[in-house]
Amino acid sequence: MSQFLADLRAKNPLVHCITNYVAMNISANVVLAAGASPAMIHTPEETADFAKIVGALTVNIGTLSPSWVKGMKLAAEAANEAAVPWVFDPVAHFATPYRAQAAQELLALNPTILRGNASEIMGLGGQASEAKGVDATDPVEAAEAGAMMLAKKYGSVVVITGETDFVTDGSRVARVSGGSEIMPMITALGCSLTCLMGGFAAIAPPMEAAATALALFAEAGVQAEKQATGPGSFQPHFLDALHNTTPETLEKAGRITWQ
C-alpha cells in the first residue's frame, strides 16, 4: 500500500475539489502537503468541463446553494462520462430536506467512493440515527451493515470514519487505526480527508486508494500529536507530517488491517 504514496508524489495528480467554504483552505493545503495538486472550482459554468480533465473529483455538500448543487451534479455526471473517479462526502445530509434531496441525487450518480461518519452512512442506508449536526453520534460498528449494503447497491467503495475507520467494497473489508484525539477539534479536517482520498483515487484502485488515504491521515495525526500542545499547534504539525511521512514509514506503521 505504501507504493501508492510514492505514486501520488511522482504523478502529482490534479484533484477537482468541490467543497464547502469552511474547508477550502485546509483541504487545498492537505492535498498539497501529501503530494497532489488541488483545484477548488465549483461554479456550474465550468465544473463539467473541468471534471473531465482531472485525475479525480471530490464533492462535499457542507455549504449548499442551488448553484452549487447544479455544479456538483454536472461535475459528477461529467466525471462518470470521462471515467474519472469521484468521491462523495454527504455532510450532515439528514439535517434538512433540501440537503437530504441533494445527497440522494448525488448518490444516485454512483460515486466511486462514498465517505462519511457513522451517522451519515447510517442515514443513507435507511437506518435510524441520533445525529443532529455534522459530527457523528453513532459508533462505526453500528453503520457497518449499512455500508456493505450501500457498497453493493451503488457499486461504490464505502468509508466510515471514526475511532477505527471502516472501508468496504461490499465484499472486502479494511480497518484503519491511528489518528489523534485532537483531530476532531479542527474544523473541516475531515472534509480535507475527502479531498486527499480523491488524490489517491486518481492513481490507485478505489478500495486501496481509500485505505491508503486513511492510513496516511492516521499516521500524520499520530506524528503531529507528539509535537502539538493543542489544536492551534496541531494543524501545522499535521501538514508537516503529511509532507514528511515516507512510504517506508507508512508501511512500517501498519495501520491497515485487511479482512
Where do the model's predicted regions map?
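Glycine/small-residue-rich loop that forms an oxyanion/phosphate-binding "nest" at active or ligand-binding sites
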Residues: 68-117
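Conserved N-terminal subdomain of the carbohydrate kinase-like
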Residues: 1-88
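Acidic-glycine-rich active-site phosphate/pyrophosphate-binding loop
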Residues: 1-8, 156-178, 249-251
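Short pre-catalytic strand/loop immediately N-terminal to key active-site residues, enriched for Gly-Thr
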Residues: 176-187
